């Protein structure tokens, strides 16, 4: 057995040596570093590159904006789903508590007072936190207490950019301190060092200061949330999502800019005037010749449309046929977009905003992207939305705004009160009629419920839509308007108190089909 193990080890070393000696790998010498070692040497540059591309490169800007538009959209909304059985509540009591809590939370979430700076509401902070995470690699959310005159809640949050969390005074990573994050002996992150200013902010006469903030307080309350994707064991900081394709996007941007410049130059119309050498010497004075020589030397070669350009004696202009627009530009650019879309885990149709294929192909691309976005939305809800809601609920219970018996005395009861789901906008519909028909069929065969279809469509609340729909039907019937097809008018009395339909006109048919009008059916 040991002989075989030795042979395997020797064979592995031999294989490694062959690869190292191969000409194909002569320039490829990656270092085997731990997760933090890679970030230590490259993270600052990666953030700078990523931010510059997000600001100046259309492909990067579109990718980042598309993610936030679908993952967060108008906002990830709370749907309280308490454990009524654990709490000993009836369904009606649970529903009433959930509705009341959702209204109070909505009041807080829709107000800019949810922000420490009073600028962004909770849903706008979701978008900012995700965007900052995507561009910088990670982001932080500070959960602070701030009292305001006439405002019943104390919780306020603040998004902290990744660069502000760093080692104090530029200290090197050592021991348990890595890139501004302190870990305990067992490896658990327990503290972040947050700089007062962004390292790129220059304030004359002011030195930067770092404040240590524990992720959890002594009482177990959350002080700081760290939004990051862990791709390797022991990874302390996250990497920008553009990391695999930074060089590709930059080169693609340069290529597209060069093609645009070439097309503009080929479209420009300019006149070149050639002067006779003898006339140039005889007619012009020494001062004027000196001036013209100087201006000619300063010409940068830029051709403006409709411009007349004087050439010096003996000069001529020859220009090759530019061949612009380049017929090969679109196929090449599309092929490069394919590479970028793979690196971003986003279908090319979504990245390019071009649904030129068939309905089936376009829908397949949208559904493929939607699976990724659902995972990302769930991650953001678990890492940011739910922890913030739990802290808000604890504060509201402590202030007497929300009644939740046993909230602070029993962790199981507290968990039952905090149960919730988070919903956002749906992916949209390429063909609304086809997709509505499919949803109707799923409900009919029992594959899904009406509530599930509403959540998947636009993240709405079935109970709210049901109540609103019932009011609409009653009001239309009251005002003499036609009730929409497929909707039965609601009754004003319970079925048990209504008179049975008169069947005397049709004794052979005891089941009057008009009796279905007594039932409320909301499609």
Predicted regions and their residues:
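C-terminal anchoring/interaction modules
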Residues: 1-13, 364-367, 379-523
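N-terminal-proximal low-complexity accessory segments that begin disordered
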Residues: 1-90, 520-523
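Short, Φ-rich (hydrophobic/aromatic) sequence segments
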Residues: 56-86, 125-134, 242-259, 380, ...
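Structured, mid-chain assembly/scaffold modules that mediate subunit interfaces
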Residues: 70-230, 442
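Surface-exposed loop-to-helix/strand elements on domain peripheries
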Residues: 95, 116, 307-430
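Intrinsically disordered or highly flexible coil/loop and linker segments, enriched in small
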Residues: 114, 135, 139, 233, ...
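Short coil/turn segments at secondary-structure boundaries
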Residues: 120, 143-145, 262-268, 312-313, ...
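Extended, charged amphipathic alpha-helical segments
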Residues: 221-362, 494-496
């Amino acid at each position: 057995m040991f002989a075989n193990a030795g042979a395997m080890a020797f064979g592995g070393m031999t294989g490694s040596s062959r690869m190292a000696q191969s000409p194909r790998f002569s320039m490829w010498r990656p270092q085997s570093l731990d997760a933090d070692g890679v970030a230590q040497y490259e993270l600052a540059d990666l953030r700078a590159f990523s931010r510059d591309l997000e600001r100046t490169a259309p492909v990067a800007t579109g990718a980042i904006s598309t993610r936030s538009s679908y993952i967060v959209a108008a906002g990830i909304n709370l749907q309280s789903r308490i454990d009524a059985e654990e709490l000993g509540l009836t369904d009606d009591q649970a529903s009433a508590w959930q509705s009341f809590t959702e209204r109070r939370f909505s009041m807080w979430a829709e107000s800019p007072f949810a922000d420490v700076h009073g600028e962004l509401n909770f849903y706008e902070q979701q978008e900012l936190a995700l965007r900052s995470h995507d561009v910088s690699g990670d982001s932080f959310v500070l959960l602070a207490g701030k009292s305001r005159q006439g405002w019943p809640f104390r919780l306020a949050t603040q998004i902290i950019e990744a660069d502000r969390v760093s080692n104090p005074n530029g200290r090197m990573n050592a021991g348990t301190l890595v890139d501004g994050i302190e870990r305990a002996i067992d490896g658990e992150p327990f503290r972040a060092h947050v700089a007062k200013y962004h390292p790129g902010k220059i304030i004359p006469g002011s030195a930067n200061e770092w404040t240590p903030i524990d992720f959890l307080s002594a009482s177990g309350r959350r002080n700081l949330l760290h939004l990051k994707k862990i791709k390797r064991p022991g990874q302390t900081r996250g990497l920008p999502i553009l990391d695999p394709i930074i060089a590709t996007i930059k080169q693609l941007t340069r290529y597209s800019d060069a093609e645009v410049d070439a097309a503009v130059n080929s479209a420009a119309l300019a006149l070149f005037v050639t002067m006779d050498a003898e006339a140039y010497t005889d007619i012009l004075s020494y001062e004027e010749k000196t001036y013209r020589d100087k201006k000619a030397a300063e010409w940068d070669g830029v051709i403006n449309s409709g411009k007349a350009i004087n050439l010096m004696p003996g000069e001529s202009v020859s220009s090759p046929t530019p061949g612009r627009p380049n017929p090969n530009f679109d196929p090449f650019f599309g092929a490069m977009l394919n590479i970028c879309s793979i690196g971003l885990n986003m279908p090319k149709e979504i990245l390019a905003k071009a649904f030129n294929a068939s309905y089936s192909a376009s829908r397949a691309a949208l559904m493929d992207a939607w699976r990724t976005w659902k995972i990302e939305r769930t991650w953001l809800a678990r890492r940011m939305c739910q922890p913030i809601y739990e802290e808000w609920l604890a504060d509201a219970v402590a202030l007497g705004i929300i009644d939740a018996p046993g909230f602070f005395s029993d962790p199981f009861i507290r968990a039952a009160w905090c149960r919730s789901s988070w919903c956002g906008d749906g992916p949209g519909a390429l063909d609304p009629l086809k997709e509505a028909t499919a949803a109707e069929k799923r409900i009919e065969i029992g594959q899904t419920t009406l509530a599930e279809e509403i959540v998947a469509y636009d993240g709405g609340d079935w109970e709210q839509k049901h109540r609103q729909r019932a009011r609409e039907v009653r009001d239309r019937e009251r005002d003499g308007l036609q009730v929409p097809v497929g909707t039965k008018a609601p009754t004003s009395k319970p079925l048990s108190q209504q008179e049975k339909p008169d069947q005397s006109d049709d004794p052979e048919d005891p089941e009057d089909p008009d009796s279905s009008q007594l039932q409320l059916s909301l499609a």
